[in-house]
């Protein structure tokens, strides 16, 4: 659902057992990704054109793949109540990872539906002080009448993880025989931080409703005498309310700061205890009207206009050496206006474009324009009855133009170890993407170009920076799927990307993902997929991770990458039960010991994961 205008698009639920086990791993989330090593740990997508737009609460960006977004909420329409249970377990003993998912949804009738889901992970981690314990829960309800429609969802997440700052010495992994202690157990490797935690809590409420204005018209099937009335929506009045509350807490218990003297040069309010607290509240409401597509033969597009109000509230520690820790507040009020042009009813040509600008408030002058066009070109033999062509090529184009102020927290921030006060310029982005795909051969080519002025990033010292020169980013992504009969499948993806200044934006020049699998059945009822998935990035100056601010910072001393990560798996499906077995990092010690994701964060060693999904329909 478009969180601004309420336009919905159909979504297909994921019921496939294919690649089930591999989907649990962090490396499968993007073609290029850095993270701190554990499941649901802080991460940064290094496939540049797959990055999400940064959140105004900068601490949430470390969990971009997992944070709540109303536009990604799925609403199910099911004749029968359904419960989907999923559980997976990885490792053993003090290194066990447990992952539980519960998803329930159902309908009272065709108009009213409800649902709720729970996602809980307790990943103890292979290395010391690296556990993660995220919890996500959401519930929704909707009503879809002939004229009035409303959707509501409430979600909360608690993303908690220990921070170890990476292992203290890269030699523990690169040259383990050089140490008398011979750190064969990663839990025994000393780390840069101890007794350190990050907690990021998010609460989100979204309510969207609309009322259709139109006429009732008689409908009938050709050759049938039955007649019924059908409502034809000519225009729609829509309105939404969105409330979001995020809170971040960075904690180093008594004595932990003393062991971190080498990491942090400053202690602005306490040398033995750190308890940084920052919060963000955002209330926004939008209202508008649109002329709907398809109410007559001349209405080939939907055209809408909207206006909205946004209020943001930031709270952080007071910049003072007094022990009162008085909270410092900042309020931002903005008025937005914009419009949308869309075309969704056609199967051959679709358009979706949205533009908005801040006309009042702190962000006045901000512009956000996005657009997407998809064209299907059919060819081949035409069906005698329907006239549908047997083949097609799909061409897609995406474009974006943004002129936006940085987050308030990029300009102003105070904590025990970091403080800054900036007056950054607006960042301008012009992005153009194109994709050509041929579904029959499972082939696609994607090209992206972005031009950036005033790029903002975090430098090697952990402080925000502005790159005053122009910068360009280019990416080429190619995907090809191959089948040999019905039993052998080979999927490949290659990403080539570069930026004009890799000291500011370092990206792996080549990233590869390859998945080779065999498909067969046992006793005609058990479907099996067995295979291996490989991930590879060329070596580059991967960023450092700063636990105190949860930001990824540039560094130019240690290259990471050039390590082939290989996972073997077996996925099975037996009616409504799916189960899998995965062996992660099968090539450990076979190729090289240099298996670092970031300078001091290595991959986890070889380990086994297994799990099951149960689909219950009442």
Name each model feature, range by range.
Residues 27-55, 256-270, 278-282, 286-294:
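Structured extracytoplasmic
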Residues 80, 195, 199-255, 265-266, ...:
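Exposed, low-structure sequence patches enriched in small/polar residues
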Residues 1-203, 211-220, 228, 378-389, ...:
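Membrane-proximal, glycine/serine-rich, low-complexity loop/turn segments characteristic
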